[in-house]
Each structure stands twice: as structure tokens, then as C-alpha cells.
């Protein structure tokens, strides 16, 4: 009994002490926690680091106190971060979020057929294969030790480690690695294509804006030229009036009656000659009466601000070679010939629908047509505002666009201005010496016009007077040239025009005929001086270079001839017959019976294809449509197709 009572008393005395221990420890810990925060706050406000003791600051003192075991479990890492951010005036939520600029480059979630670990293993394997580390003698020794330490029991089972199974496992592993490499490269290529498409889209938008700016620039440049012309006319009229007051009355009366006073003797002849020359000349428009009297004044005031000649072509430097710039439907039938003055300038097109149309290339605006030919135009050339056209009606017509020769195709206006039975003819001059259809012509920069017809003659014209200067006769040349008299024309090409191609350079004229011969004529003597033999089909196009002659033929080839030796230095084979070719700064554009025009760089032997992209907003071309005529100037290429469409490419 005594022992039991003593045990119960001891237990009753221990119970209160054990129950008070957690309460005392919890209270003490709570007090110490609050006191620690108070001390830290006081230290933060009353102590600061000094240059002498930079290590003594509130943060260092507080962190030093955290090393006490009694406080470590109370102040966790998250509580310290919250305390630090709250005492530095930073919002904890804002400090834990990433800024928006860092979130912009996060790619969208995409499903891939390989994991990150697989991709890393493949790339790491490739890197180890491409740049293996050198094995030293110590590594070789360690390798031998490792090989000798392999447990023999691991390879004792012949059923698992047969040579065939090992080879199969290696091949499977290698195939998996190659598959992953293929997927990685395909993914990278798709990413590159996506970036390129975005860049191309941006580039196209910038080019569209630049084109609009260029059109506005052309419009305001035209307005500026009109205003300057009015200013010059006004100043010239004032000068003429002041000049007339200085004349005696007899001289004025003589001038009114048609007699030329002495003061006008020299100028009258000069201006009369200028008027006759400028009526057709492509160099300058016809001046007004006031301008005739004071032409010297115009020459002295030629320093008026003018638009640069290459202003229109500033856009073309930003295009990629072979890219489509514009496309439009010009005619309803086969385009026989086309030419343009300069990029974003005037474009003239001729077709078998018996129309010749003039366009503004800047905005693809139809300006009007040239009326006068009774049959379709087979060839044409344009220089500035001057156009020469050769037709199957045996005539050559000259047009000066500054003389308002364009027909607006207005039925009401046409019925009022001309009788129904009388054809409209707005040509400035008509050349009628040929007796057969005109099939080729060439217009040089020094105002030399050469035409060729089925009457087997080539004629040189004075474009001012409209007279034929000389005639180059092929019949006479064939009878006196024994080397070319034996060449026969195939029955396949007997219906083709006798002369399809002409070009001139200074006093030299190159002619290409249906028999595949190229003759070089000297205009000073009117005779052929050399013949280039090599083509086996009709010549379709010719163009001179400074030292070479480029020829295209129906024999599916383009030849480059050396003018000094007369031999071909290069032959470019084509898949089909060549319809037209043009050369610009060492790049040759060739239009054949293939769907697209090809550009060949004669220096670097590179080539491009001028194709129309499927995603473009261009018109739908006929399946069998081929380019029939091409022109190439100032990095811009224009081709006309058999379906009547016209395409403009950067080249």
C-alpha cells in the first residue's frame, strides 16, 4: 500500500510539471521571436554601414543572429525573403513575377515527336563524334583496368549477347539517333522557313508602301514640271512683249504681213528648222510660240529644278532578282511586241488583235491606243516619247506622244469627231517605201531607224523628214556572196517572215533571217561585210554588245558571237525555241516557248527564273501561255505572253 501510494503521489506531482513545460517553451519562443524582430527593426533604423566598417549593416547583423539553433526553425527561408522584401519597399508578388519583355520571346506550346533529353543526347553524341577528346596513356591504362574488372558472369549468358543481337541493338540505336537528327533538322528548317516567310511578308509590305510613295513622287513631279513650264511661258511672253516694244512700227507691220524684218532673219530660219525637226523628233516636244522667240532665254533658265532621271527607278534597287512586281491583262490575243521607255514610265504593247496600247507603268493605267494601221503591228520600239511601229500593212508609222496622238477609245467622242467610214489615223508620219509586211525594226539612241520587211530589204530612215536614206537588198547580197547562196530553208519555216530580227550599233546593222544566217551590214557602204553561220533555224532576236552579238533562234539555242573573229564564244542550250532576248549589264533575258523567262548572268554563269508565285494576287494565266516578247532595262524586265498578259519583274 505504501509503495503504491508513493508511486501515485510521485506521478501526481510530475503531471503538472510536464504539462507546464510545453506552455513555458512556447511562450518563451514566441517572446524571443518578437524580441528578435524588434531588435532587427531597431538595428535597421539606427545602424547603417559606414565606409570604415562596410560589413556592419542591419542585414549582416540579422543574418548572423539566424545561426542560433533556437531561432533557426522559426525563421525559414520563405519568411526571411518576405521580411527582406517588405523592409525594402518591394511588393513580394511583383518581385516574384517576370517582366513582360521577358515573356514575349517564349514560344508557343508545340507538340514534338522527341523529348528534350533525346534531343540533347543526339546533339551531345554528334558533338562527341565531331570533336573527340585525345586519349592519353593514363586513360588507356584505366580503360584496360576497367575492361579487366568486368564481371564475367555478365557475358556468360550467350542467349542475350549473341553477335547478331548486339549488331541489331547497335543498328536500332543508330537508326533512332538518325531519326531524331532528322526530326531536329526538319524542325529547325521549318522554323527558318517560318521566319523567312515573315520577313518576306514584311518586305512586301515595305515595297508596297515604297511603290505608293514613288507614285506620289511621280505625280507631284509632273505637277512641278507643269508649273515650271507655265512660269517659263509667262516669263517668255513678258520678254516677247518688252522685245516687241523696242521694234520700229514698220518692222512690226512687216512681221504681221508675213515678211520677216531684218531683226528676225537669222532666228526665223533657225526656228523654222527647229519646228520641222521637233515635229517628229523624240528629243523634245513642240515648243510654244513664245518659247520659239526666246529659246535662248529657255537655255539660260534651264537650271530650273527638275526631277532626276532615275527617280522612277529608285524602287527597283530594293527588289529581289526574278520577283514579280506587277501583272495585268493588256490584250485579248497574242502579244507580238512591246517596249518601255524606262521603269515606271511609258509602256507600249502590240497584239494580233490589231491594237497598239500605251500604258503608264507606275500605276498600270491605260493611257490610250495608237490608231492608223489597217493590220496588226508586228514590231515596235519606243524612245522617250517617240514610238515607231511596223505593221503587216507594209507601213511604218511614227508617233510623238507629246502631240496628243493617243486615241481614248471613247465611242461617243469617236462618232462626233470622225465620220463612220473614215478610219482614225493619228500618226505623226507614215513611211510607205516597203512593198511587203514589215516584220522587224530597230531604233538606236542616235535616232537611226532601221526596218526590215518580207520584200527582202532593210531600209534606213530619216525620222525627221520621213525619207528613206538607203536600202539594203538581200537579193543582191545573196547573188554576190557564194558562201551563203547554198543555204536552203526548211519546209517547216517557209511560212515564217524572211527577216525577224534587226539591231544597230553605230554604222553596223545586224540582220537575222529565216535561213539562220546573221549578216553584218556597214551603213557607210550599204553592203554586208560579214556573215555568222551556226544557227540551223530562223533567227528570232538579235542584240549588240560592245564586243559581242547575242542571237536567239528557233533551233533551241542562244549564241554569243565575237564581233572581231566572227565565231561563237558561248552557246546556251534551251529546251524550246527562242522567241525573244534582251541584254542589260551582262545579264541576258531569254523568252522561249517555256512558261517562264530565264535570266543568265554571262559573267558568273548564274541564272534565275522569272516565275509568278502561286500565292500572288496576279491574274490566272492560261496553261499553255508562253512569253513571246521581252524587254530589259534598268533592272526591270517586262514580258508579253501569248494569252495577252503582261508581267513586270525585277531583274
UniProtKB/Swiss-Prot annotation:
WD repeats lie at residues 330-369, 372-409, 433-473, 492-531, 534-573, 575-610, 620-650. The keyword DNA damage does not apply. It is a peripheral membrane protein. Residues 130-140 have a biased composition (Polar residues). Residues 1-21, 125-144 are annotated as: Disordered. Residues 1-12 have a biased composition (Basic and acidic residues). It is found in: Mitochondrion outer membrane. Pfam families: WD40 (PF00400). It comes from the Eukaryota. GO terms for biological process: mitochondrial fission; peroxisome fission. Its main location: mitochondrion. InterPro entries: G-protein_beta_WD-40_rep, WD40/YVTN_repeat-like_dom_sf, WD40_repeat_CS, WD40_repeat_dom_sf, WD40_rpt. Keywords: Coiled coil, Membrane, Mitochondrion, Mitochondrion outer membrane, Repeat, WD repeat. SUPFAM superfamilies: WD40 repeat-like. Residues 195-229 form a coiled coil. One of its GO terms (cellular component) is cytoplasmic side of mitochondrial outer membrane. Involved in mitochondrial fission. Acts as an adapter protein required to form mitochondrial fission complexes. Formation of these complexes is required to promote constriction and fission of the mitochondrial compartment at a late step in mitochondrial division. Belongs to the WD repeat MDV1/CAF4 family. This is Mitochondrial division protein 1. The lineage of its organism: Eukaryota, Fungi, Dikarya, Ascomycota, Taphrinomycotina.
